[in-house]
């Protein structure tokens, strides 16, 4: 869950530069021992989340903290929450100022940036026994090959979901609602039919992002995680399919700038046939778009291989005065029982080992929401965190979007557009490495 925006694209390099320059102040090489003990569970630490202090989650976290403090009487956990807007910028600013909280909620992209500047604790070294407590794919998602193979976050929750389709719209546009697409080839073929039969509606309203390339079967980086490679022939093939669809007017110009919120709005309005979503999406459509909900069909996430999933983690500040407490609290929040409770409340999926086997994720009670959850659980078992942690959600994502847009508009070839995007990202990695 990473905020985006053009302003962040402009400042991303500056932020990392300031972090690297300040690393001598905040202990960037992690060689100076913190003041507290590595194992002592006592003292006061700050725990930071983003966009979670609200009517839905406040009581959960208050109870969680109270239970931990009761089990560990010489501890105090101060919980702070930040708004989603500008969250990653604030993380970078706090890290540069030496005021990053002890335990922080973030995804792999933000963690990679801070770990690159030496701000985060390498849990592979500081807490190697923790690895077995989590799904291997989740632990590996927080293990950064490009930074020497260190692991920089305790895995927390995962998210993926099905594809939602408007059956009424499919039938109107000469498509069979009983034959939903499951691969990108099928999706593009059906989108082309829609473009011919229903010029005022569309199948797709989102530009390809880096995870789309992964799901399509494109190699995103080299084996060492130091060079991006998504400009290979398979990557060109993917964007060519979008270009062909755009030429057929199956993807209008507005889609070149669409954010996810616009895509959801179009689906709820009955003008879009396909929406990638999550377990949360079903109830949202039921409550806010009942006319679309009654004609809803649900299929697996579109993929040519392994579907995508997202991961959130809890990282530990390498300069925490109480590293033992910080590690203990982060592992407490992410233990199986607490992950299960949070997943039930937030409509997400646990990363703790064995928790997906709980009946909540496996037993069907006949409710449509339960069916979606069970199918998504099966998808989690096969899913991959396709977004490379070294791929900046601001600078790299914006560059990729802009280059693809130029290719779709005919201002440059698809190959030259992807070459430019890959060159930009690789130059940024080299400059910051």
Q: What label would you give each PLM region?
A:
Residues 2-113, 132, 177, 325, ...:
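Conserved N-terminal structural module of periplasmic/extracytoplasmic solute-binding proteins
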Residues 66, 70, 171-173, 248, ...:
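Extracytoplasmic/periplasmic substrate-recognition and gating elements
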Residues 70, 145-208, 221-256, 318-324, ...:
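Helix-loop-helix "hinge/cap" segment bordering the ligand-binding cleft or interdomain interface
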Residues 81-90, 109, 182-188, 254-268:
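Short helix-initiation/N-cap motifs at beta->coil->alpha
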Residues 102-105, 273-278:
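Paired acidic/hydrophobic, glycine-rich loop segments that form the ligand-binding mouth/hinge
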Residues 108-160, 295-297:
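Hinge/lid segment of periplasmic solute-binding proteins
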Residues 124-137, 180-182, 196-197, 218-240, ...:
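Short, solvent-exposed loop/beta-turn-alpha elements that line the ligand-binding surface or hinge
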Residues 372-421:
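C-terminal capping/gating helix-and-loop segments adjacent to ligand/active sites or protein-protein/ligand interfaces
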